[in-house]
């Protein structure tokens, strides 16, 4: 989980700039800082999964995050659409209308992610741990 779109990369960049300044003034960069961005860029070390809701603003924000990651050379492949009403097959009129509105954004994520996405249906309770990982096999 990260800061809003773009802020994460700015924080990484600011951290790197800070440590470059420390290195300039003191002569050394901590190993953890030197390894951070290379680790984030290494698909053998890091998997980046973009998580969004099937709504306009979250999809646009996630799309901008994907663009920022591309610019930073950080690979990302999978997207998760979380808490989808469209995946619940609800019969409630209000929820059904909201579910129909999600379809456009699910299709947008399908396009952006080149069909590398999963949809997790809305659950009334918070899902954690092993239960969460089981949702990906449903």
Predicted segments, located by residue:
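C-terminal lobe/tail of nucleotide-utilizing enzymes
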Residues: 41-46, 53-138
């Amino acid at each position: 989980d990260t800061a809003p779109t773009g802020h994460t990369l700015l924080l990484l960049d600011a951290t790197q700039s800070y440590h470059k300044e420390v290195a300039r003034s003191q002569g050394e960069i901590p190993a953890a800082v030197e390894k951070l961005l290379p680790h984030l860029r290494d698909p053998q070390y890091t998997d980046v999964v973009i998580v969004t809701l099937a709504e306009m603003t979250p999809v646009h924000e996630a799309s901008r995050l994907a663009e920022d990651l591309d610019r930073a050379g950080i690979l990302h492949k999978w997207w998760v659409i979380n808490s989808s009403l469209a995946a619940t097959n609800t019969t409630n009129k209000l929820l059904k209308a909201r579910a129909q509105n999600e379809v456009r954004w699910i299709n947008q994520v399908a396009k952006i992610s080149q069909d590398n996405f999963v949809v997790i249906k809305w659950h009334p309770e918070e899902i954690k741990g092993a239960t969460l990982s089981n949702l990906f096999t449903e």
